[in-house]
A protein has these predicted regions:
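RNA-contacting regions in translation and RNA-metabolism proteins
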Residues: 1-40, 46, 53, 57-75
Length: 75
């Protein structure tokens, strides 16, 4: 899931070298996405639409392997 999130985020931003994902395992897997401050709007989108879409795609991919994944976006 981490690789999928990296791929999606890097394709959206102007500074793909500053994209990082930290994976925290537990009952649920938490993926913390960090991007450059100037790219934050591109990852969140208007009214959070892009962020919602990213979460939906990652959750759908995770559900295929019976996992629960939460995507958090940090700056």
């Amino acid at each position: 899931m981490k690789e999928l999130l990296l791929y999606i985020a890097r394709s959206l931003v102007d500074h793909p070298d500053q994209v990082s994902v930290t994976e925290l395992e537990g009952e649920e897997t938490v993926l913390e996405l960090r991007v450059a401050p100037e790219d934050m709007g591109k990852v969140i989108g208007k009214s959070g639409r892009i962020a919602k879409s990213i979460r939906a795609v990652v959750s759908a991919a995770a559900s295929k392997s019976d996992k629960k994944v939460i995507v958090e976006i940090d700056n």
